[in-house]
Curated annotation (Swiss-Prot):
Listed EC numbers: 2.8.1.10
Subunit structure of this chain's protein: Homotetramer. Forms heterodimers with either ThiH or ThiS.
Pathway field: Cofactor biosynthesis; thiamine diphosphate biosynthesis
Source species, domain of life: Bacteria
GO biological process: thiamine diphosphate biosynthetic process
UniProt: 1-deoxy-D-xylulose 5-phosphate binding residues: G157, A184, G185, N206, T207
Subcellular location: Cytoplasm
Protein name: Thiazole synthase
Family of the protein in this entry: Belongs to the ThiG family.
Length: 257
C-alpha cells in the first residue's frame, strides 16, 4: 500500500493512457499492471469528440483514479487554463502539471512550472509537477505549495532509463519526507526497479508499455519490477564494496600441516 496525499493506493505504478494500439489493449494493460492511477490528457478528450467520450467511459469502467495532465502546454497561461478545465471535466483537484520549454527534448520550463504550480496550489489543486532532477527547482516547487515531486530520469519517451543516478540519489536524500515519483525516460522494467531501489516512492510511465510489442505483458512486467524494487529497498540493500568479502566463515576450518 502507498499513501499519497491522503489517498491509499494499492500500487506504486502510475500508468499513462496514450499511444496504445487499441482501447481494448489499453484496458488489458491497465489491469495487468495492477496500477490504481492513470494519467489522462484533457487535450485528447476535447479533440476526440465522440471517440473521446468512449475513451472516458472506458477509463471510468476500469475503476482507477484519474490524474489529468497538461501535456503539450508551453506557457503558464495555457497550463493553468487546461488544469482548470480538467478539474471540471474529470472532477478531481489532482493535476500533473507540465509546462514544456523545449520542443526537441520536451524538457520542462522550470520557471513557468514554478509559477504555474503557485497559481494552481493557491486555487486548491494538488499539483504533481513534472520537473527535472534539480534540487533548487524542487525547493521552489515545494515553496509554491506542491506536496509531491515528479522528477524525470531521462527525456520523455527516450527509454534511456536513469541517466544521472547521482542526482536522483541526492534528491531522495534531500527530501526524505516528500513523495517522489520518477516520471519520464523509463524504458525497461529493470529501470523501474533501479529507481525504486533508490527509495523513490513510485514511478509513472507510458511509452515503454504502450509501444511495446506486447503492451499487456510489458505492463505486467513493470508492475512486478516496481514491487520488486520497493521490496528490495525496504529489505535493506547491501552497499557495493571495492574488495571481496567471503560469504563462508573462516572459523572452524581444518588446518593441515
Amino acid at each position: 500500500m502507498f499513501e499519497l496525499l491522503g489517498t491509499t493506493l494499492p500500487s506504486r505504478l502510475l500508468l499513462g493512457t496514450a499511444q496504445y494500439p487499441s482501447p481494448a489493449i489499453l484496458a488489458d494493460a491497465v489491469k495487468a499492471s495492477g496500477t490504481s492511477v492513470v494519467t489522462v490528457s484533457l487535450r485528447r478528450e476535447m479533440a476526440g469528440g465522440r471517440a473521446g467520450e468512449k475513451f472516458w467511459s472506458l477509463i471510468r469502467s476500469l475503476g482507477v483514479r484519474i490524474l489529468p495532465n497538461t501535456a503539450g502546454c508551453h506557457s503558464v497561461k495555457e497550463a493553468v487554463t487546461t488544469a482548470k478545465m480538467a478539474r471540471d471535466v474529470f472532477g478531481t483537484s489532482w493535476i500533473k502539471l507540465e509546462v514544456i520549454g523545449s520542443h526537441d527534448t520536451l524538457q520542462p520550463d522550470v520557471f513557468g512550472l514554478v509559477e504555474g504550480a503557485r497559481i494552481l496550489c493557491e486555487d486548491g489543486f494538488s499539483v504533481f509537477p513534472y520537473t527535472t532532477d534539480d534540487l533548487v527547482v524542487a525547493e521552489r516547487l515545494l515553496e509554491a505549495g506542491c506536496r509531491v515531486l515528479m522528477p524525470w530520469c531521462a527525456p520523455i519517451g527516450s527509454a534511456l532509463g536513469p541517466v544521472n543516478m547521482t542526482a536522483l540519489r541526492s534528491m531522495r536524500g534531500h527530501f526524505p519526507d516528500v513523495p517522489l515519483i520518477v516520471d519520464a525516460g523509463l524504458g525497461r522494467p529493470s529501470h523501474a526497479a533501479t529507481v525504486m531501489e533508490l527509495g523513490f516512492d513510485a514511478v509513472l510511465l507510458n511509452t515503454a508499455v504502450a509501444r511495446a510489442a506486447d503492451p499487456v505483458g510489458m505492463a505486467r512486467a513493470f508492475g512486478k519490477a516496481v514491487d520488486a524494487g520497493r521490496e528490495a529497498f525496504s529489505s535493506g540493500l547491501l552497499e557495493p564494496r571495492e574488495v571481496a568479502v567471503p560469504s563462508t566463515p573462516i572459523f572452524g576450518r581444518a588446518v593441515f600441516s
